[in-house]
Amino acid sequence: MIYLYLFGTCFHFIYVFMIIGNKLESDIKTEQCHGICIRYGSNIILSNLQSGFNRGDGLYIGNVYLESNIDHSPSYISVINCIFSDNHRQGSSITRANHVDFLGCKFINTNGTPPQAGLDIEPNDINISAYENCYYACENIRINNCFFSNNAGNGLLVAGRSKNREGKYIVNNIFVNNSVFDRGNIRAFGLKNMQVKDCDILTDSYGWLTYRYSTEDVLIDKCKIICCNKNNDFVGIKVESTSENKHNNIIISNCSITNFGKFGIFFNDKIDGISGRIVNNIFHKCGKNMKKNDLSKKIEYKENIYND
């Protein structure tokens, strides 16, 4: 295991390095034995690393250090052409960070202790004073040209929380582009401003799920979402609201959604708690076609095509 406690503004490089954990040598279930752990610091570049078979995460970014009016978030971290494979809890976790870029990385074969995601962006629970300072956040995270495959949980999990007392989200600005989810999917909630563009999502269950905590400003654009199970009862994209969680400005556009036995898109909204747009999508072989009158008046629905 490598722990990085780096301070200052100079650049720190780690490259062409392999870490093999002892997951196969122990039956003990654990979550904290990480291959690489970045607790502090900024301007860090990880390049061409492999971190696998760890009894925690392949890469962990975050800390629990709190101090009034000082931000101790790890920041400006670039992870380039790295492979996180066969780890026990996650391929990679981010619990606190600002400006993290993943480029050309692989998150594969995570299996052991839930959530078992390829990449999990999930702030830890902290006391209310820390929420008010907004310094315990996950913000400005970019995922480009990455590959997620055969993880026991989600390919990508973005698990935010309720707004703080100032009405702000602590998960903000998540961007996913040109990435492939092979036998994987995306679960995202409790956040503001997430964009997923030009991605292929091949799943054996649902493709996308938003629920649990209120979510704002989500764009799913130019994505191919396909269920690989021939006979199934799944939904391609599901957004679910209750009296306690409403979702605003959810936009699904220019996507092709294929072979979901129940719905291509299902907005489970009995309280008019979802607003957004569903436009210019193509549905292939989906069990039930969504009609405009199935949706709340806050949803713009037009120019979608159904090919049965």
Identify the role of each PLM range.
Residues 11-18, 42-53, 72-90, 98-111, ...:
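Right-handed parallel beta-helix
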Residues 2-3, 23-27, 34, 55-61, ...:
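Short glycine/acidic-rich loop motifs that flank beta-strands on beta-rich extracellular proteins
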Residues 1-13, 22-43, 58-70, 94, ...:
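Extracellular beta-strand-rich solenoid/capping regions of secreted or surface-exposed proteins
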